[in-house]
Amino acid sequence: MKPPRLTDTTLRDGSHPMRHQFTRQQVATIVQALDRAGVPVIEVSHGDGLAGSSLQYGFSHTSEFDLIETARQHAERAKIAALMLPGIGTRQELKEAVARGVQVVRIATQCTEADISEQHFGLAKELGLETVGFLMMAHMRPPEELARQAKLMESYGADCVYIVDSAGAMLPQDAAARVQALKDTLSVQVGFHAHNNLGLGIANTLAALEAGADQIDGCLRGLGAGAGNAATELLAAVLDRLGLNPGLDVFSLMDAAEYVVAPIMPFQPFPDRDAITIGYAGVYSTFLLHAKRAGAQYNVDPREILVELGRRQAVAGQEDWIIDVALELSRRHQSSARKESRP
């Protein structure tokens, strides 16, 4: 293993549990703390990427462009990154983000849809950006298929391609196999982004590093969607113990998590019943509330709904399946009950 490059995404993935309510002052304080601690890349944007502020994904308290500008002003050494999802962010948003200080763009697609990112990588390269590809929900497809998708992103201009465990559903061997497949296929760097829904964020990141990952992600205090991400301060401590510290100040990151981020967190993400269900089922956390509502309407345990959605490999944008699955399960339960009641 070699020391990886760490991207802290507290100010992007952490926007989900913060309900996209970060302020300029909070961004300034967090960026300063991360920058002083030696974090080389800090991601700042709406939780769903550039232009995510909307009725569908949740409105931001402060324009993400203002937050990006604030981050750039307070980062002496770190690069500022932003997430972009084709279909949400457009050319205009990316150009504005660059004008405000973005130096790295991370372009995210569903893990089977890398082909929709070609124009976005092309524009990013025209703008002189470092480019990173994100293959989301990567637990759903086998390693060899992910490698083919990653190869497309590489051909479009990606400088690194990430395996992204969006649902926190992977086991360590899953993370290792997927990273290894990309390392065997690509000539560019490979990254890994963990979520902690099964309590394996750190373990999966270590497995990815053992398989050759060049870049990894973390959030201070684990502040991220679902049960959160691998905690940046924990990653720093573990990397230091392994002799793989890439220049991070472990104590400074511990202090940043404890005294800067913890006081503003609405709650501490952890693997509670809901988060475990998301990881166990392998679905997006955005399905959870809809499944609970459908479960109440049709008298079905929402966990059953989520597990069935995972079996059907539902992804974001297919929330309409939830009612269909709830109704189908309700009818199935009623049929079973009738059979059991017969003499």
From Swiss-Prot:
It catalyses: (S)-4-hydroxy-2-oxopentanoate = acetaldehyde + pyruvate. The keyword Manganese applies. This is 4-hydroxy-2-oxovalerate aldolase. Belongs to the 4-hydroxy-2-oxovalerate aldolase family. It is an enzyme of class 4 (lyase). GO terms for biological process: catabolic process; L-leucine biosynthetic process. The active site is at residue 16. GO terms for molecular function: 2-isopropylmalate synthase activity; 4-hydroxy-2-oxovalerate aldolase activity; manganese ion binding. The record marks 12 as: Transition state stabilizer. Pfam families: DmpG_comm, HMGL-like. Keywords: Aromatic hydrocarbons catabolism, Lyase, Manganese, Metal-binding. It comes from Chloroflexus aurantiacus (strain ATCC 29366 / DSM 635 / J-10-fl). Mn(2+) binds at residues 13, 193, 195. The keyword Nucleus does not apply. InterPro entries: 2-IPM_HCS-like, 4OH_2_O-val_aldolase, Aldolase_TIM, DmpG_comm, DRE_TIM_HOA, PYR_CT.
